[in-house]
Regions:
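Active-site cofactor/cluster-binding pocket
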Residues: 2-213
Length: 213
């Protein structure tokens, strides 16, 4: 078991995004990597109105002993938002003192906005920071698209998350090898590496206004 987490420490992680973004896969890979290191792991998920296009959140908790799969508000060590507005929606789960919010700088416009019922709320990263949250925005969708498939943005974000989670690099690579089908494996390993590099690159964190789809 990794020595960076004490026997009494439980690490709390929340993935949030829109159905179809690979939120569940991101959480599953994280959970499997933790299991491979001998941690007790609990995971749960919540879907929105529709499985594709609706809000999706997944909680992952790991430590020497974990009793509940649910992360309570204000207790998450890491929130991974695969979409800007979803990151804002679940920001209150982050620990204000020690937590981190990773945000994919990508906007998925909901139907209500497309139908002109309301405006998409821009400035989410700035708003979260104004409330005291530590936020790192990443251009995960662009990085994934540059690698040939924007759908790998979730793996880019996993790569970024791996730089702050107390799990060794080899555990992530071994999990990706086991979980990703062979024909997609190399491209996903490249996406994972791109996420790690971006998370460590200060300039990469100065992302422009989120793109729209």
């Amino acid at each position: 078991m990794a020595s960076t987490v004490s026997d009494g420490k439980v690490f709390n992680l929340l993935f949030a995004g829109v159905g179809g973004q690979g939120v569940l896969l991101g959480a599953e890979i994280t959970a499997l990597a933790a299991v491979s290191e001998g941690y007790d792991v609990k995971q749960t998920e919540v879907h929105g109105v529709s499985q594709r296009g609706g809000s999706v959140e997944t909680h992952v908790r790991f430590g020497a002993r974990v009793w509940s799969p649910v992360v309570t508000p204000g207790k998450a060590d890491l929130v991974v938002g695969l979409e800007v507005l979803e990151a804002l929606r679940f920001a209150h789960f982050a620990n204000l003192r020690e937590g981190l919010i990773l945000v994919n700088q990508h906007e998925i416009i909901p139907g209500s906005v497309k139908n002109a019922e309301q405006d998409y709320p821009h400035g989410s990263v700035e708003f979260m920071r104004s409330r005291g949250y530590r936020v790192l925005p990443l251009e995960a969708s662009r990085l994934a698209r540059d690698l040939g498939d924007a759908r790998m943005a979730n793996v880019v974000m996993i790569g970024a998350a791996s730089t702050v989670l107390p799990l060794p690099h080899d555990a992530w690579l071994e999990t990706l090898h086991r979980r990703i089908p062979e024909r997609f494996r190399q491209s996903n390993l490249e996406a994972f590496a791109a996420g790690r590099e971006a998370a460590c690159d200060v300039e990469a964190l100065r992302a422009p206004r989120p793109e729209r789809s």
